[in-house]
Amino acid sequence: MEETYTDSLDPEKLLQCPYDKNHQIRACRFPYHLIKCRKNHPDVASKLATCPFNARHQVPRAEISHHISSCDDRSCIEQDVVNQTRSLRQETLAESTWQCPPCDEDWDKDLWEQTSTPFVWGTTHYSDNNSPASNIVTEHKNNLASGMRVPKSLPYVLPWKNNGNAQ
C-alpha cells in the first residue's frame, strides 16, 4: 500500500482509497475523501490506523509499528524537530544587550510651558493665564436652529427598557 504514496507531489496522481478499493482519488482531493470515506465505512476504519507522520497513510493496526519505523515522512518530521531544537538553543545563548534609552521627556512640564491653549470642541477661551485648567470656559453653545430642540429619548426602544416595566 505504501507504493501509492511515493509520488505525493503530483496533485493529479490517482490514489487508491484504503476504505473502498473501487475509489481512485486525485492526490489533491485525497485528504478530504479520506474523511468522508472513513465515516461511510466505520467497520474498515476500525481496522486501520493513521500514521502519525502523514494522515494520508492508513495502514492495518497490526502493521502500524512497522510502518512508523519505516515511514518516509518520518525523516521530514525528525528533521523539523532537530532544526527547532537547534534554533531554540541559539536563541537562549544569545542574550539581548539592548537597553532602554534614558527618558528626557517630562510631559507635565511641557504642559505648563505650552503657550497655545488646547482645542476643545464647543468651548471658548478667554484667559491669558497659562494654566490648562483656567483656559477652558464651561460655556456650552447650542448650535441648533432656534425652532429645533435636542430629543429627550433615543429614536428606538432599548430591549431592557420595556415602557418602564421591569421584566
From Swiss-Prot:
<feature type="binding site">
    <location>
        <position position="51"/>
    </location>
    <ligand>
        <name>Zn(2+) 2</name>
    </ligand>
</feature>
<keyword id="KW-0479">Metal-binding</keyword>
<dbReference type="InterPro" id="IPR022776">
    <property type="entry name" value="TRM13/UPF0224_CHHC_Znf_dom"/>
</dbReference>
<keyword id="KW-0677">Repeat</keyword>
<dbReference type="GO" id="GO:0030154">
    <property type="term" value="P:cell differentiation"/>
</dbReference>
<feature type="zinc finger region" description="CHHC U11-48K-type 1">
    <location>
        <begin position="14"/>
        <end position="41"/>
    </location>
</feature>
<feature type="binding site">
    <location>
        <position position="23"/>
    </location>
    <ligand>
        <name>Zn(2+) 1</name>
    </ligand>
</feature>
<dbReference type="GO" id="GO:0007283">
    <property type="term" value="P:spermatogenesis"/>
</dbReference>
<dbReference type="InterPro" id="IPR036236">
    <property type="entry name" value="Znf_C2H2_sf"/>
</dbReference>
<feature type="binding site">
    <location>
        <position position="37"/>
    </location>
    <ligand>
        <name>Zn(2+) 1</name>
    </ligand>
</feature>
<keyword id="KW-0862">Zinc</keyword>
<dbReference type="InterPro" id="IPR051591">
    <property type="entry name" value="UPF0224_FAM112_RNA_Proc"/>
</dbReference>
<feature type="binding site">
    <location>
        <position position="33"/>
    </location>
    <ligand>
        <name>Zn(2+) 1</name>
    </ligand>
</feature>
<keyword id="KW-0597">Phosphoprotein</keyword>
<keyword id="KW-0744">Spermatogenesis</keyword>
<keyword id="KW-0963">Cytoplasm</keyword>
<dbReference type="GO" id="GO:0008270">
    <property type="term" value="F:zinc ion binding"/>
</dbReference>
<feature type="binding site">
    <location>
        <position position="71"/>
    </location>
    <ligand>
        <name>Zn(2+) 2</name>
    </ligand>
</feature>
<keyword id="KW-0863">Zinc-finger</keyword>
<dbReference type="GO" id="GO:0140991">
    <property type="term" value="P:piRNA-mediated gene silencing by mRNA destabilization"/>
</dbReference>
<comment type="similarity">
    <text>Belongs to the UPF0224 (FAM112) family.</text>
</comment>
<feature type="binding site">
    <location>
        <position position="17"/>
    </location>
    <ligand>
        <name>Zn(2+) 1</name>
    </ligand>
</feature>
<feature type="binding site">
    <location>
        <position position="67"/>
    </location>
    <ligand>
        <name>Zn(2+) 2</name>
    </ligand>
</feature>
<feature type="zinc finger region" description="CHHC U11-48K-type 2">
    <location>
        <begin position="48"/>
        <end position="75"/>
    </location>
</feature>
<keyword id="KW-0221">Differentiation</keyword>
<dbReference type="GO" id="GO:0000049">
    <property type="term" value="F:tRNA binding"/>
</dbReference>
<dbReference type="GO" id="GO:0140965">
    <property type="term" value="P:secondary piRNA processing"/>
</dbReference>
<dbReference type="Pfam" id="PF05253">
    <property type="entry name" value="zf-U11-48K"/>
</dbReference>
<dbReference type="GO" id="GO:0071547">
    <property type="term" value="C:piP-body"/>
</dbReference>
<protein>
    <recommendedName>
        <fullName>Gametocyte-specific factor 1</fullName>
    </recommendedName>
</protein>
<feature type="binding site">
    <location>
        <position position="57"/>
    </location>
    <ligand>
        <name>Zn(2+) 2</name>
    </ligand>
</feature>
<feature type="modified residue" description="Phosphoserine">
    <location>
        <position position="8"/>
    </location>
</feature>
<comment type="function">
    <text>Required for spermatogenesis and is involved in the suppression of retrotransposon transcription in male germ cells.</text>
</comment>
